[in-house]
């Protein structure tokens, strides 16, 4: 298993097209970045996109569990501009056997500039009923807690 620094700490360069007329990042980009960081984290950990996300090329079997977003929030602490090199820190947390969330911290030169949170719920793809998280996500969540103290 790779070091969690490899799959829970990512980098992103802010592109001009992600900014608005004032030259700062448009608010909705933060949610896109959060989701993309989650996807990249899964890939770096070793989970193929096709195992989690429907519609992937060369998919052998459609995932039987969907992970829709049921809650999201974002806060900007400082303006983020085109050209900024951001560090993204992911903090995944299992909330119960069928639900997890990922907290995201966006840093510029070790200073927090934004935060995001996305919560996912596991549902059966066919019936849309709640279910347990798929095993690859369970393993990813478990691995993310290695070396981290959890509250009692």
Curated annotation (Swiss-Prot):
Record's protein name: 1,4-dihydroxy-2-naphthoyl-CoA hydrolase
Residues of the active site: 20
Record-level Gene Ontology MF annotations: 1,4-dihydroxy-2-naphthoyl-CoA thioesterase activity
Involved pathway(s): Cofactor biosynthesis; phylloquinone biosynthesis; Quinol/quinone metabolism; 1,4-dihydroxy-2-naphthoate biosynthesis; 1,4-dihydroxy-2-naphthoate from chorismate: step 7/7
HAMAP family in the cross-refs: DHNA_CoA_hydrolase
Biological source species: Synechococcus sp. (strain CC9311)
Family named by the database record: Belongs to the 4-hydroxybenzoyl-CoA thioesterase family. DHNA-CoA hydrolase subfamily.
UniProt KW keywords: Hydrolase
InterPro entries (alphabetical): DHNA_CoA_hydrolase (IPR022829), HotDog_dom_sf (IPR029069)
EC annotation from Swiss-Prot or TrEMBL: 3.1.2.28
Cited function: Catalyzes the hydrolysis of 1,4-dihydroxy-2-naphthoyl-CoA (DHNA-CoA) to 1,4-dihydroxy-2-naphthoate (DHNA), a reaction involved in phylloquinone (vitamin K1) biosynthesis.
Taxonomic lineage: Bacteria, Bacillati, Cyanobacteriota, Cyanophyceae, Synechococcales
Reaction catalyzed: 1,4-dihydroxy-2-naphthoyl-CoA + H2O = 1,4-dihydroxy-2-naphthoate + CoA + H(+)
GO terms (BP aspect): phylloquinone biosynthetic process
């Amino acid at each position: 298993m790779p070091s969690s620094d490899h799959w829970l700490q990512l980098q992103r360069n802010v592109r001009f097209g992600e900014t608005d007329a004032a030259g700062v990042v448009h608010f909705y980009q933060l949610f896109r970045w959060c989701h993309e960081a989650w996807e990249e984290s899964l890939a770096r950990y070793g989970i193929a996109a096709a195992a989690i996300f429907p519609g992937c090329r060369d998919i052998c079997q459609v995932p039987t569990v969907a992970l829709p977003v049921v809650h999201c929030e974002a806060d900007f602490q400082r303006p983020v501009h085109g050209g900024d090199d951001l560090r993204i820190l992911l903090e995944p947390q299992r909330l119960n056997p069928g639900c997890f969330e990922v907290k995201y911290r966006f840093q510029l030169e070790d200073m927090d500039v934004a935060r995001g949170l996305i919560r996912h719920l596991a549902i059966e793809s066919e019936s849309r009923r709640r279910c347990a998280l798929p095993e690859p996500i369970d393993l990813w969540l478990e691995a993310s807690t290695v070396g981290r103290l959890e509250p009692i």
